From Swiss-Prot:
Catalyzes the attachment of alanine to tRNA(Ala) in a two-step reaction: alanine is first activated by ATP to form Ala-AMP and then transferred to the acceptor end of tRNA(Ala). Also edits incorrectly charged Ser-tRNA(Ala) and Gly-tRNA(Ala) via its editing domain. The lineage of its organism: Bacteria, Bacillati, Bacillota, Bacilli, Lactobacillales. Its EC number is 6.1.1.7. Belongs to the class-II aminoacyl-tRNA synthetase family. This is Alanine--tRNA ligase. Gene3D superfamilies: 2.40.30.130, 3.10.310.40, 3.30.54.20, 6.10.250.550, Bira Bifunctional Protein, Domain 2 (3.30.930.10), Threonyl-trna Synthetase, Chain A, domain 2 (3.30.980.10). It comes from Ligilactobacillus salivarius (strain UCC118). GO terms for molecular function: alanine-tRNA ligase activity; aminoacyl-tRNA deacylase activity; ATP binding; catalytic activity, acting on a protein; transferase activity; tRNA binding; zinc ion binding.
């Protein structure tokens, strides 16, 4: 067997299948495009759904790829096993209704064993087949597999719900007994068993059945091949590595982490090795995910990124790394993957910035979590408990990123255990919720042979004309091909020629009417979508009967169409203006182009400031008023990229592409409709900017008449405001508002002064009430103040006057909450008394928790009725 690097293995796989007539498909971004059922691209086949369910017919029915993927259902196993990863690459070859079992098996064996390719030892390869799949077994024997190396397995049937399914064959590599974790005679020591000797390296799925909604199976109209070879696994075979982590995909990251650690080295300590592996795995995942547009947040993909970063940071602390470090691993990841993913190094600066910001932010979160943990420990001890309950411990893990091991360590220091069973129950409930949310995500959709088989030629002419004659070629009603559309019915129809734009790239479909040769309106066009083979398929409401092979006049609603194209060109200008103002890291995350407004989603770390929004708006309007010609160029993809055309992030393009150029300012791949000159847009106005998800912002804007109407509405609102403020000139409105704000500010200051005076009067009474408890003086009482800031002022007065050894003050706020503050004199602190310990002892009485310094601590609570009990608890604490 050859000595190959991961880059060589990846390239050799793709080159082999390219030699067999496959198109090499570039890895799609990790964020699914137009597939709301998936959180992440989680397999090679995930990008093939549209082909396998027949909704789109590929240009080449043979495809191969190395697809980056993320799976997060087993995060806790990462670092503890040899092959669990969050990010991985799946090598795959796919046949969409083309070759089937014989070719798939023959080529798999050739790639694995041919000296020209992988050159694996045939004697070390084992195959599993589905017992009823006699053809697969026959073909494996025909290519030369020893029958004793072929195993039948009942679970060799790939089925994930509705859609394509079928038997599969798994290929195992015998790494030798020295790699095994079991005795040679163990019942699990066989290909397919739970052992480390026989490593699964490839799975070939023969999709030949449709799993129907009623649970039955029927033969697929078009049989498919779907294979998956985990790159990390096969690299470990070629590089004779015991685990995936001892390969060139991970070792450089581990070595860099060791450099950053407090003298730790990989391979010296099992516990430290877990941390090294976790960090290496998570560094890869967050680097690629952020590069593909996912940003840390508290929901969806962003939550996954945040959790991975926090878990890596906590493991860094176990290695003695106390400062932000994960971001320093990004260039290492980029260098390892450079041959296949050069964009990682190109984006490295931005990715590093995002990770470092999140690492720094986690330090603050860590403090909040520690306060909650301290409160939980104090409350448990107060109630005589022996272990921390599982539910709040899981909250620490889930919300604050506290690993269970860390919580256990702190609990043990306080003489407590942790309810791990309760914790695991909470974990399982969360996983169940996640599985339920993903239940539909795996289904590929039942293959529709009818639409897939329609190959009628249909020409779109709407770029140049909005009225055209077309012959009605296909009529579909209730999923059946028919010859006539009855009056007052709905149908899907295809013409040999159409001016109607089909919804694509965020642009809505054209609307309009269809007329017969007598000029009568026979149908209204309600929607237009692309059929699997690319034809424009019109959804119509027929007013009169329509018949196949008759010629009709197709007429687009010109006013509707013109409004849409103005907004589409404005979207291109907005896209470029965003990059000009915010930076090159910003890219499109979605768009909607309607006749009345446009919506544009884009990646950005935070909200766009009002100042930047104005800059963006000014740039777009400047380009509109420059009267720039808009041109379209149809060329090959490579030439378009050399021209500098920007491709929509995540979109797939054929060999021939259409490029829309707005002078020298904007140049994008686009199949939409556009104005001939920017002056047709007239005016551009941003109406809102908001967040829609993890690191994704949304701008909504209007153009032309809608922009004028928007400004007119705002002018009316200003006029009404001026009337309410009793001023004549609209321009005086801001000044009048400033005056009112100053008056409000003055009144608030006066109110605060009165509250401070009242608080001091109360304090004077409380400060006189000094108790002697166990040799220490205590002042404890409830005051009627507005909140924590005034409690701190009273504590400062107490400190200046040195009135007692210990101070405890409480107040009930207007919203039904409690604020507590404790203070210890400097002499008492020297004797070992700590305000933080005192606050932890009394805060549970008001249903809260807190912490602080030895001389000053504070807490919040939600039980005002417990204030007197908390004050009494302070006396008990001193008595101890």
């Amino acid at each position: 067997m050859k000595e190959l690097s991961s880059a060589q293995i990846r390239q050799m796989y793709l080159d082999f299948f390219k030699s067999k007539g496959h198109d090499v498909m570039k890895s799609a971004p990790l964020i699914p495009h137009d597939d709301p059922t998936l959180l992440w691209i989680n397999s090679g086949v995930a990008t093939m759904k549209k082909y396998f369910d027949g909704s789109v017919v590929p240009k080449n029915h043979r495809i191969t790829s190395s697809q980056k993927s993320i799976r997060t259902n087993d995060i806790e196993n990462v670092g503890h096993t040899a092959r669990h990863h969050t990010l991985f690459e799946m090598l795959g070859n796919f046949s969409v209704g083309d070759y089937f079992k014989k070719e798939a098996i023959t080529w798999a064996w050739e790639l694995l064993t041919s000296p020209e390719w992988f050159d694996m030892d045939k004697e070390k390869l084992y195959i599993t087949v589905y017992p009823e799949d006699k053809d697969a077994k026959k073909y494996w024997e025909e290519v030369g597999v020893d029958p004793s190396h072929i195993y039948e397995a009942e679970d060799n049937f790939w089925d994930i719900g509705e859609g394509p399914s079928g038997p599969d064959s798994e290929i195992f590599f015998d790494r030798g007994q020295e790699m095994n974790n079991l005795p040679e005679d163990d019942p699990e020591s066989y290909p397919g068993g739970e052992n480390e000797r026989y490593l699964e390296i490839w799975n070939i799925v023969f999709s030949e059945f449709n799993h129907k909604p009623d649970g039955t199976y029927e033969p697929l109209p078009h049989k498919n091949i779907d294979t998956g070879m985990g790159l990390e696994r096969v690299v470990s075979v070629f590089q004779h590595a015991r685990t995936n982590f001892e390969t060139d995909l991970f070792l450089p990251i581990i070595e860099k982490t060791a450099e950053l650690s407090a003298g730790k080295k990989y391979g010296e300590n099992a516990e430290a090795d877990v941390s090294f592996k976790v960090i290496a795995d998570h560094a890869r995942a967050v680097t690629f995910a952020i590069g593909d547009g996912a940003l840390p947040s508290n929901e969806g993909r962003g939550y996954v990124i945040r959790r991975l970063i926090r878990r890596a940071v906590m493991h860094g602390q176990k290695l003695g790394i106390d400062e932000a470090f994960l971001y320093k691993l990004v260039p290492v990841v980029g260098k390892i993957m450079e041959s296949a993913y050069p964009e990682v190094l190109e984006q490295a600066e931005f990715i590093e910035k995002v990770i470092k910001m999140e690492e720094d932010r986690f330090n603050d979160t860590l403090k909040d979590g520690m306060q909650l943990l301290d409160s939980l420990i104090a409350e448990t001890k107060e109630n005589g408990g022996k272990e921390l309950p599982g539910k709040p411990v899981f909250k620490l893990y889930d919300t604050y990123g506290f690993p269970l091991e860390l919580t256990k360590e702190y609990a043990n220091d306080e003489g407590l255990d942790v309810d791990e069973e309760g914790f695991n129950e909470e974990m399982e409930q969360q996983k169940a919720r996640a599985r339920a949310a993903r239940s539909d995500a795996k289904s590929m959709g039942v293959q529709n042979g009818l639409l897939t088989d329609i190959t009628t030629s249909s020409e779109y002419v709407g770029y140049h004309e909005l009225k055209a004659n077309g012959v009605l070629k296909d009529i579909i009603i209730d999923n059946e091909l028919v010859d006539t559309v009855p009056a007052d019915s709905r149908a899907q129809v295809i013409f040999d020629k159409t001016p109607f734009y089909a919804e694509m790239g965020g642009q809505v479909a054209d609307k309009g009417v269809i007329k017969n040769q007598a000029g009568e309106v026979v149908a209204e066009v309600e929607d237009v979508q692309h059929a699997p083979n690319g034809q424009n398929m019109h959804t119509i409401h027929a007013l009169k009967e329509m018949t196949r092979e008759n010629t009709y006049s197709l007429e687009v609603d010109v006013a509707f169409h013109n409004k849409v194209k103005k907004n589409h060109t404005a979207t291109h200008l907005l896209d470029q203006a965003l990059r000009d103002v915010l930076g090159s890291h910003t890219h499109q995350a979605g768009s909607l182009v309607e006749p009345t407004y446009l919506r544009f989603d884009f990646t950005n770390l935070g909200s766009v400031t009002a100042e930047d929004l104005k800059k963006i708006e000014d740039i777009v309007n400047a380009k509109i008023w420059e009267n720039i010609q808009v041109e379209t160029v149809v060329t090959d993809k490579e030439s378009a990229e050399k021209m500098g055309a920007i491709a929509l992030f995540g979109d797939k393009y054929g060999d021939t592409v259409r490029v829309v150029k707005v002078g020298d300012y904007s140049m994008e791949f686009c199949g939409g409709t556009h104005v001939a000159n920017t002056n047709e847009i007239g005016l551009f106005k941003i109406v809102s900017e908001s967040g829609v998800g993890a690191g994704v912002r949304r701008i909504e804007a209007v153009t032309s008449e809608e922009a004028f109407e928007f400004l007119e509405e705002r002018n009316q609102l200003l006029r009404q405001s001026a009337d309410e403020l009793k001023i004549v000139q609209i321009k005086e409105v801001p000044r009048k508002i400033e005056q009112l704000q100053e008056q409000v500010k003055l009144l608030e200051q006066q109110k605060q002064a009165l509250e401070d005076k009242f608080a001091s009067q109360q304090a004077g009474d409380i400060f006189k009430n000094i108790k002697d408890i166990n040799g220490k003086t205590l002042i404890a009482g409830q005051v009627n103040v507005s909140g924590m800031s005034q409690l701190r002022q009273l504590a400062d007065q107490w400190k200046e006057k040195q009135l007692s050894d210990v101070l405890v003050l409480a107040t009930a706020t207007a919203d039904g909450k409690v604020n507590l503050i404790t203070a210890i004199s400097s002499d008492a602190v020297k004797e070992g008394y700590k305000a933080g310990d005192l606050i932890k002892a009394i805060a549970p009485k008001v249903g809260g928790g807190g912490g602080g310094r030895p001389d000053l601590a504070q807490a919040g609570g939600k039980k005002p009725e417990g204030i007197q009990e908390a004050l009494k608890a302070a006396e008990d604490w001193l008595n101890k």
